[in-house]
Amino acid sequence: MTEITNLQDKVDVDETLLNIITQAVSLTLNEEGRAGVVSIALVDNNYIQSLNREYRQKDVPTDVLSFPLADDKDDEVLGDVVISLEKAAEQAKEYGHSFFREVAFLTVHGVLHLLGHDHYEEEETRIMREKEEKILSALGLER
């Protein structure tokens, strides 16, 4: 299940965007063989910068932050994903793809972090990118 809260007013949030986020979470959980509740907070750059400063000691806006809550695979609540829609819009323009693709990517990326994936090592990065592209392709949002 996906709970989405819009805490910003810089970028319009419509049904299409909400559906893409919900589908991205669902496909990611299915791909990983997991079930549970994922909370998505849609924020602006100022909001995510304050979280980034508090939790990562980085005083800059970022695109997505994940806060895992599950201790094991049986936990129902998996955690929170915070996405800056303002940053997503900037990055979509910079990377030359749609805003919807960027938000879907950030959603998948954030949920994979909730499930224990990371990209500190080269091999971990490769595995995570393959999973992201497979899910985005299933959403019809490949590059």
Curated annotation (Swiss-Prot):
Keyword Iron: no
GO BP of this protein: rRNA processing
Details of cofactor binding: Binds 1 zinc ion.
MF (Gene Ontology): metalloendopeptidase activity; RNA endonuclease activity; zinc ion binding
Keywords (A to Z) from UniProt: Cytoplasm, Endonuclease, Hydrolase, Metal-binding, Nuclease, Ribosome biogenesis, rRNA processing, Zinc
Cofactor: Zn(2+)
A Pfam family assignment: YbeY
E.C. numbers: 3.1.-.-
Keyword rRNA processing on entry: yes
Major localisation: cytoplasm
Domain of life: Bacteria
Binding of Zn(2+), residues: H109, H113, H119
Function: Single strand-specific metallo-endoribonuclease involved in late-stage 70S ribosome quality control and in maturation of the 3' terminus of the 16S rRNA.
Protein name: Endoribonuclease YbeY
Gene this chain is encoded by: ybeY
